[in-house]
Amino acid sequence: MNTLDWTQLTADARTQALTRPVQTVATQTREAVATLIADVRARGDVALREITARFDGVTLESFAVSDAEFAAADAAIAPELRQAMQDAVARIDTFHRAGMSEGYAVETAPGVVCEKIVRPIGRVGLYVPAGSAPLPSTALMLGVPARLAGCREVVLCTPPRKDGSVDPAVLVAAQLTGVRRVFKLGGAQAIAAMAYGTDSIPSCDKLFGPGNSFVTEAKQQVAQSGAAAIDMPAGPSEVLVIADAGAQPAFVAADLLSQAEHGPDSQVLLLSDSDALITAVQEQLDLQLAQLSRADIARQALAQSRLIKVATLQDAFEISNRYAPEHLILALREPRAWLAQVEAAGSVFLGDYTPEALGDYCSGTNHVLPTSGAARAYSGVSVASFQNMVSVQAASKAGIDGIGACAVILARAEGLDAHANAVALRMGVAA
C-alpha cells in the first residue's frame, strides 16, 4: 500500500489519493453495457444464452432453478453452515423489523387529515453476485427485508457455475428468506433481463444488489431509462479505517484485508495520526497477506489503496466525510464520542471489537450499502427500500372552507386557473 502524508499533499494530490479505481474504468464499460442491454431487449432469452455462454462458459437450456436443484442444494450444505445462516437471518430480521415504518396520520387543519400509508413494491429483483466467490450472505441481506416488506413476488438472479449449477449455499439462503424464483443468470445481462423482462425472466419494478462495475453501470442505465428503479449505486467494496495510536495493528490490518480480498477493484484506506501505528499496520499486512487463500486478489487491491498520515483525528473525519465510504471503522479509544463527526458513510463500526465482517454476515445490519461516494446521498438497504410511502389526504366541507383560500391564492400566483377553480367551486365562491 502507498503511504502518504496528508499535510504534504497538494490539492490535486489529495483528490488523486481519494480517487476510487472503478471511477477510472466507468467510461470504458458504459458503451459495452449499453450494447449488452440493447441485445437483451431485442433478442431476449436467445441473447441471454449467448451472453451466458460467452461470459460464464456454460450453455443453459433453462435459466430457472428447479425444485430438484433446491433439494440437492439443501442436502449438500454442511449443518453448521445452515445453522449459521439461520442465526444470521434471525438477527437480520430483528434489526430490520425494528426499523419498519407503520405510516402515520395527522390533522393539519380542522377537517383536514393527511396520511402516509405503506405499501410493498409489487415485484422486486435481487442480484447476488458470484464473480470471484459466491455470496449467500447477500441473498440473506436482500431476502429478509423483501419478505418483511411483503413484496408480492421476489425474483433472484445469480451467476451459474461452469457445470450449469448454482452455489448450493446461495440457494439455501434464498429458501431461508422465502425466495423460490431463482434464475441462473449473472452480470449486466441479469440486470437487463430483470429490468425489461424476457420469456423466462419476469420484469421487475425495482432491482437490488451489489456487483462489479458492469453490474453497477447496468443498474444505472436501466434506472435512467425508466425500466426499473434501483436501490443505489452498489459497486466494488471499500473500507476506510480511522485509527488512533491505541488501535491494535493486527486488527486494523485484518479489517483492511477483509475488504481487499473481495476483488482487485476494491479499495481500502487507513487514516491515522500515528506514524507508529501506520508502520505496524504495514508490517501486519505483509504477515497476514501471506496466509490468505485470496492473497493475489488482495494484493492487487492493496496496490491502489492508501495508508494516510493525518495531523489530527479531526482531519481524518473531514477526509472521511469527503470520501463517503461504504464501510467506516472507528478504531479509536472513544469511538462513540466521535460518531457525531460522521456525516457520510454506508455503515459504521465502533471500536476494536466490531470488525466490518460482523456487519457483512451476522450482526443484523444490512451489508448492501452505497459505494463510490454515494453514501453522501444514499442509505443502505432496509425494509423501506422495498416499500412505497403513499400520501393520502381527506378534507371535509369545513376543512376546504378553512384552507381553500390558501390554495386559490397560490394557484392564481402560478397562473393555474383550473387549480383555483377546482377549489373555489367546492367552497361555493368565484375563483
UniProtKB/Swiss-Prot annotation:
Task: State the reactions this protein catalyses.
Answer: L-histidinol + 2 NAD(+) + H2O = L-histidine + 2 NADH + 3 H(+)
For this record, an example GO cellular component is: cytosol
Which residues hold NAD(+)?
A: Y127, Q189, N212
- Specify whether Glycoprotein is a keyword of the entry: no
Biological or metabolic pathway of the protein:
Amino-acid biosynthesis; L-histidine biosynthesis; L-histidine from 5-phospho-alpha-D-ribose 1-diphosphate: step 9/9
GO BP annotation list: L-histidine biosynthetic process
Query: Which keywords does UniProt give here?
Result: Amino-acid biosynthesis, Histidine biosynthesis, Metal-binding, NAD, Oxidoreductase, Zinc
Pfam families documented for this protein: Histidinol_dh
Q: Which residues bind substrate?
A: S237, Q259, H262, H327, D360, E414, H419
Q: How is the cofactor bound?
A: Binds 1 zinc ion per subunit.
Entry's EC annotation: 1.1.1.23
Enzyme class comes to oxidoreductase
- DNA repair listed as a keyword: no
User: Which cofactor does the UniProt annotation name?
Assistant: Zn(2+)
Gene Ontology MF term list: histidinol dehydrogenase activity; NAD binding; zinc ion binding
Q: Where does Zn(2+) bind?
A: Q259, H262, D360, H419
Q: Which residues form the active site?
A: E326, H327
Q: Which CDD domains match?
A: Histidinol_dh
Going by the entry's taxonomy, the superkingdom of the source organism is recorded as Bacteria
Describe the function of this protein. Catalyzes the sequential NAD-dependent oxidations of L-histidinol to L-histidinaldehyde and then to L-histidine.
Family affiliation: Belongs to the histidinol dehydrogenase family.
HAMAP family, from UniProt? HisD
According to UniProt, the name of this protein is: Histidinol dehydrogenase
